[in-house]
Structure formats: structure tokens, C-alpha cells
Amino acid sequence: MAQYYTTMNLKSRFAPSPTGYLHLGNARTALFAWLAARGAGGTFILRLEDTDQQRSPEIYERALLEDLRWFGIDWDEGPDRGGDHGPYRQMERLAVYGRYYAHLQSSGQAYACYCSADDLAAERAVQRSAGKAPRYGGRCRHLDAAARAEREAAGLLPTLRFRVPDQGTLTVPDLVWGERHYALADLGDFVIRRSDGSPAFFFANAVDDALMEVNLVLRGEDHLTNTPRQILILQALGLPVPAYGHLPLLLGADGQPLSKRYGAASLRDLRKDGYLAAALRNYLARLGHHYSATGFLDSRALAQGFALNQISRAPSHFDMVQLQHWQHEAVQSLDDAAVWNWLAPLLRGKVPMGLEMPFVAAVRANILLPGDALDWAERCFGAPALAADAVEAITGVSPEFWSVAQATLQASGGDYRRWTKALQQASGRRGKALFMPLRAALTGLTHGPELAALLPLIGEERALARLHAAARRPSTPIETTL
């Protein structure tokens, strides 16, 4: 039944509905499908399932393409670049679907259904009260031409239903879940065209995959129950059936599936926060997929290490702490110039000209997001606020210590090593007792980058002013030494 791909002809796709900004669950689906194609040297298609016109404004299509490109995903065929199997928007393919609807109707495998939403709701309620699974009972299945004409004369607009065989079992192989078996009698006849003439998801999605020669479909676990219906459609039309693999759910911190309708973080949100695409790729690629390599990987290595048999069935939980780990790894993978290019939109005018690279070299190990770098720019070149523990460290030494610190700094000409060695000898302080108050006075924090790298950025004049300000704070009564 399923026409399995080979590494010579693998063709996968991402087929989102542009009804909102790309959320992380769909971003992971796109990434897995892209990694499968790129790892095998295959083809990757982007197709837009835009039949929900009320929820698919053009702004979301533009945003989707922009976000995917930023994420590092490219495509060989798609709505913006064309291809041999277009068009790549479903609303531009209605004539294509019409031909296949006509075929199913002429062969008796589809029929017009005039049941109203109220009729169907009442039928489902009766089935539930009897302890049965809801399914269409087939009220319109055997209407003759006269009965159909009567209903249409009354202004009823029919849907089109696929006629499911009354008996038998359909076996569906899945690359993640293995074989699953469905009793056809439990499926019920399902809608393949809405009453307004627009195609239902089951139908358009399956037909497009076949006509675009997609032979590997990776999508979310929530589509598992769609698969038997789509295979029935393809078999009825004599179209090829792709290999299906359904990815485990991606859950939020609350244990609920991530969804763009219910406030899930979007790729765009994280991009605006300053997260790097490489960090998100490394993290999402590992949510539901095992890599033998545990370190940071570029896109090529992620694709080469991707294997369908390494996809887990267990749901994955999105964890910001883990994303921050990969963000740190991504930042550290960049050279200083690339880090500056990432930070520059926020830091222009905050870092003196000529000090951009020394600033990056000094603080890069201490930043996850551009906002962190902005804080360090203020601490180096502005008027930093003092943290509570910094005030405690400053007031824990005597004013005389600060006087000696100023004098030895001036004598050293701003050389950090000479200064701290002279101050150690003059004050009798060493280690944390020496460096903690200095760090607190110079940066307003008790932690951070190496002071040796920060002092040239702060500059001797600014450093002296901060040491002088520290001397003016009253020391605590327990201070007995310089």
C-alpha cells in the first residue's frame, strides 16, 4: 500500500494553515520534515493550506515565510518560488479538486449530503447516550435523484461525503507508531467538500501530497486518526499513498499541547526576545528525536544525524531552561564579529566606536540575550545601579581601602595586573576579599566577566570616579582592616 521513499527520491513537505504566527509545535514539525529531506539529499516542499479564508489573512502568510527563512528552513518548491507541481496554495487548486470530486461522484464513491448541523448534532447526541462512538449514520447515503432535486429546490446546499465501505479493516503502517488497524465500520462516511464548495482538510491534503509526489509525510500525532480516511481517498482515486510518520505531541509547561490558538510561544516571539535560530534548531531537533551527539550542531550535522527510527513516541515538554542552554551554546559558537552583528541593533550608540570587539570579547560568556549585553554596556560605559549584595560588599571595607585603591590605580596607569598587585600589598587583602569589593564598586554587581577585561572598557577616569563614590559610602562597624 504505502509507497516508501528511498534516499534517492525522498520528498517531504510542510503544509501549514496560515492562520496565525508559527508556534513551536509547527516549527518542530517543519524542522523534522526539512531535516529528513536535507539529510537524504531529497526535496522539500512548502504548501499553504489556506482554505479557512476567514482566519488566513495575507499578513500571516508573509510572516510564515519570513519566520521559516529566519529559522534556517529553505524549500525547493513553494508559493513564492513555484515548481513543477504548483500552485502551492490550496485556494488556487480548487479546479484540481473539482476533477477528483467528479470522479468520486461518478464512480459512486461520494454522494451529496443535505443534513444540517442541527441534524448531525442530534444524531451524535443519540449515539453518545447509547454509549456509541459518534459517526455519520448515512441518512443521505441512498437518496435518489428526485430526493436530491427536492432538497436543492428548497435551497439546501449539500456537502459531499466519501462513501466508506461497510465492512473490513484498514491497516495503516506508521514510521513512528508501527501498524495500526481501523475497522471501516467505525469510521463513518466523512465530508470531503463543505457546503460552500471549499475542500475539507482530509481531501485536499491527501490529494495534494499525491499530485506533488510527496512520499514522506511527517506531521503531529493529532493527525493519526486522519490517516485512514486519507488512505481511503487515495486508494479510491488510484493515487499513490505516502509513508506517514506522526510526531509525538509537544507539550507546554502546563502539560497541555502547544497551540497557536491558546497562547503558545511563537517562533516570532522568541526571535524578538533575541533567541538565535541555531539555538532553536538544536533544541527543537532534540524534542522527540535522539541524537548520539550531545553538543551543539550546525544545520548540516543536524540533518546528517536525523533518523526516523530515532523519533520517540513519548510526548516532549518544552523547557525554557533547556532552550537557554542551547542559546548559550549558539552564542559561544559565533565569532566576535557575528556576536556584534547580533547585538548591534540594540547596542548602537551604547558602546563607544572602536570598542565594539573588545566589549564583545569581554562580556560574551555572560550574555544569553541582547538585553544582557545592554546591561553590561551600561555597567561599562554608563551609570550602573548597585545591586544589594554589591552595596554590602562595598560597605564591608573601610574608606581607607578605597583611597588606597584610587591611588594605586593612578600609579599603575590603568594596568589591571599592576594595580591589583599593588593594592594587595598595600591593603593586605587577597582573593575574594580583594576582588569582590572592587567588582562591586566598578560594575555594581558581585559577579560577571573578568575584571581584567572590563577595566579597559570602563576606563581609568570612570573607574576612579566609581572608587571615589564607593569611598563615600559609610563602612560597616565590623571593618577593621584596609
UniProtKB/Swiss-Prot annotation:
GO molecular function: ATP binding; glutamate-tRNA ligase activity; tRNA binding; zinc ion binding
Disulfide bonds: none
Catalytic activity: tRNA(Glu) + L-glutamate + ATP = L-glutamyl-tRNA(Glu) + AMP + diphosphate
The enzyme's E.C. designation: 6.1.1.17
Free-text remark on how the cofactor is bound: Binds 1 zinc ion per subunit.
GO biological process terms on file: glutamyl-tRNA aminoacylation
Motif ('KMSKS' region): 257-261
UniProt: Zn(2+) binding residues: C113, C115, C140, H142
UniProt GO cellular component terms: cytosol
Enzyme class: ligase
Chain positions of motif 'HIGH' region: 16-26
Subcellular localization(s) per the UniProt record: Cytoplasm
InterPro entries registered for this protein in UniProt: aa-tRNA-synth_I_cd-bd, aa-tRNA-synth_I_codon-bd_sub2, aa-tRNA-synth_I_CS, aa_tRNA-synth_I_cd-bd_sf, Glu-tRNA-ligase_bac/mito, Glu/Gln-tRNA-synth, Glu/Gln-tRNA-synth_Ib_cat-dom, GluQ/Sye
Tagged with keyword Nucleotide-binding: yes
Cofactor: Zn(2+)
The organism's place on the tree of life at top rank: Bacteria
Positions of ATP binding: K260
Pfam families given in the database record: Anticodon_2, tRNA-synt_1c
Assembly behavior: Monomer.
Entry-linked HAMAP family: Glu_tRNA_synth_type1
PANTHER family: GLUTAMATE--TRNA LIGASE, GLUTAMATE--TRNA LIGASE, MITOCHONDRIAL-RELATED
Membership in a protein family: Belongs to the class-I aminoacyl-tRNA synthetase family. Glutamate--tRNA ligase type 1 subfamily.
Function: Catalyzes the attachment of glutamate to tRNA(Glu) in a two-step reaction: glutamate is first activated by ATP to form Glu-AMP and then transferred to the acceptor end of tRNA(Glu).
The protein, known as: Glutamate--tRNA ligase 2
